[in-house]
A protein has these predicted regions:
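Amphipathic alpha-helical interaction segments
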Residues: 14, 88-89, 196, 204
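A eukaryote-biased signal for long
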Residues: 118-211
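Eukaryotic non-globular interaction segments with acidic/serine-rich, low-complexity composition
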Residues: 1-20, 115-131, 135
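An exposed acidic His-Trp-rich patch
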Residues: 71-131
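Short N-terminal edge-element motif at the start of the domain
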Residues: 1-57
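Aromatic- and glycine-enriched beta-alpha-beta binding-site module
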Residues: 39-85
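Intrinsically disordered, low-complexity coil segments
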Residues: 17, 28-36, 61-64, 68-75, ...
Length: 211
């Protein structure tokens, strides 16, 4: 997302500093549903509290400086998830992507038969996989795990299936769009925070280096 798109989408309505606590309040305008959402970011005790209509996230696990941590040109949602201490919704929901499961099963079978790509497999093997996914699979991660485990065990007599199926299921889970949304907003705020503080006569350096 470009800077211009962020400016059009987000509107800072207030920034308030009380001691070493900084609060940033924003409105978010969404053209897709013609709605406006409210979000509050609170920086306090080297933690970041993100809350509002889009969910709640608390970051702070082993972060050296909360005001600099999220700065940059691209978000790092996977690494930042390790720094999230709490969230109102799962960052990785307990549903799996059926197409991704099928893709990862195909990759595993290719490795099992030591071929470089799926088309090199025997037609009989490809038919077995095709039949398995013809009508879809369970999307709940635990049921999907059991289903794929039994399938690979029965059809391919695979060994060490626990770790194999675990990797398949984990690889097929999609990260929460609300969490990614929050990461984008947090990074945009941190990238602009110093300028906003100057405009409001807030001592930004004091926030970076509290006494």
């Amino acid at each position: 997302m470009t800077r211009e798109e962020f400016v059009e989408r987000y509107k800072v309505i207030d920034i308030e500093k009380q001691g070493n606590i900084l609060t940033v309040k924003l409105y978010i305008s969404e053209n897709r549903d013609d709605k406006t959402y409210f979000v509050r970011l609170i920086f306090a005790d080297n933690k970041l509290f993100y809350s509002g209509d889009m969910g709640t996230y608390v970051f702070g696990e082993n972060i050296c400086n909360i005001f600099n941590f999220f700065k940059g040109e691209r978000i790092n949602e996977g690494y930042w998830q390790e720094k999230c201490e709490a969230s109102s919704y799962p960052i990785y929901p307990s549903e799996v992507d059926e197409e991704k499961v099928e893709e990862l099963v195909k990759e595993y079978v290719c490795d099992l038969y030591r071929v470089e790509n799926y088309e090199e497999l025997d037609e009989e093997i490809k038919d077995v996989i095709k039949d398995k996914f013809r009508f879809g699979i369970e999307t709940n991660e635990f049921r999907a795990y059991d289903e794929i485990y039994e399938f690979l065990k029965e059809e391919f007599d695979s060994s060490d299936l626990n770790s194999v199926v675990y990797d398949i299921i984990e690889g097929a889970k999609s990260i929460s769009p609300n969490y990614v949304y929050a990461c984008e907003l947090i990074q945009w705020v941190e990238n602009n925070l110093e300028d906003w503080c100057k405009e409001r006569n807030i001592n930004y350096e004091e926030l970076l280096n509290p006494r």
